[in-house]
């Protein structure tokens, strides 16, 4: 009886492992198709940003940046800022758009996540509004590197100082 129970438990564990492996393969194929479709459109993938249960691509072509389904015209970008917990720590302003005297640095309301972790974001200010690229609060170095990569690419594109 004990051997039968052990065999059933082993079979259940094998079925669970096979299910997890199949799900992981499907997820990898879906991500691969997404990357391939971005490249087929002539876009360069800058970063894969974790969002919820999936990854959002931040990509670029000659005239635009793409954050998920949103497109951001490079010519309309006025400034880019790195935010940590909603407060700006680095900024670059486009020389195409002179800074207005009443313009204040971008900041967003801090959302406490329950655990003391820093949340890294990049705010891309355009003529039409601000796009917040949420790089996350996974682990400090991971989110920080994602934010730094996005910031540097956008800063280089707008010719900020």
Regions found by a protein language model. Give the residues of each.
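Acidic-enriched, low-complexity/disordered segments with a strong bias for Aspartate over Glutamate
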Residues: 3, 36, 53-54, 61, ...
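Generic detection of short hydrophobic beta-strand segments and adjacent strand-loop junctions
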Residues: 47-49, 72, 131-135
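Extracytoplasmic/periplasmic/luminal assembly and interaction segments
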Residues: 57-86
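Acidic, Ser/Thr- and proline-rich intrinsically disordered linker/docking segments
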Residues: 80-161
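Sequence-level detector for tyrosine residue identity
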Residues: 27, 66-67, 97, 151
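Glycine-centered tight beta-turn/hairpin loop motif at sheet-sheet or coil-to-beta transitions
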Residues: 53, 69, 127-130
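Anionic N-terminal interaction surfaces
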Residues: 2-64
């Amino acid at each position: 009886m004990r051997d039968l129970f052990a065999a059933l438990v082993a079979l259940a564990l094998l079925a669970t492992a096979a299910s997890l492996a199949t799900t992981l393969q499907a997820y990898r194929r879906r991500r691969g198709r997404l990357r391939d479709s971005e490249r087929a459109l002539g876009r360069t993938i800058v970063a894969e940003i974790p969002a919820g249960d999936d990854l959002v691509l931040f990509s670029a072509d000659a005239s635009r940046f793409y954050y998920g389904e949103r497109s951001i015209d490079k010519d309309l970008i006025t400034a880019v800022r790195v935010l940590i917990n909603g407060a700006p720590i680095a900024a670059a302003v486009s020389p195409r758009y002179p800074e207005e005297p009443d313009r204040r640095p971008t900041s967003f309301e801090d959302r406490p996540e329950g655990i003391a972790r820093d949340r890294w974001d990049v705010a891309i200010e355009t003529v039409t509004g601000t796009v917040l690229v949420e790089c996350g609060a996974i682990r400090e170095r991971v989110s920080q590197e994602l934010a730094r990569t996005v910031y540097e690419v956008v800063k280089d594109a707008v010719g900020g100082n």
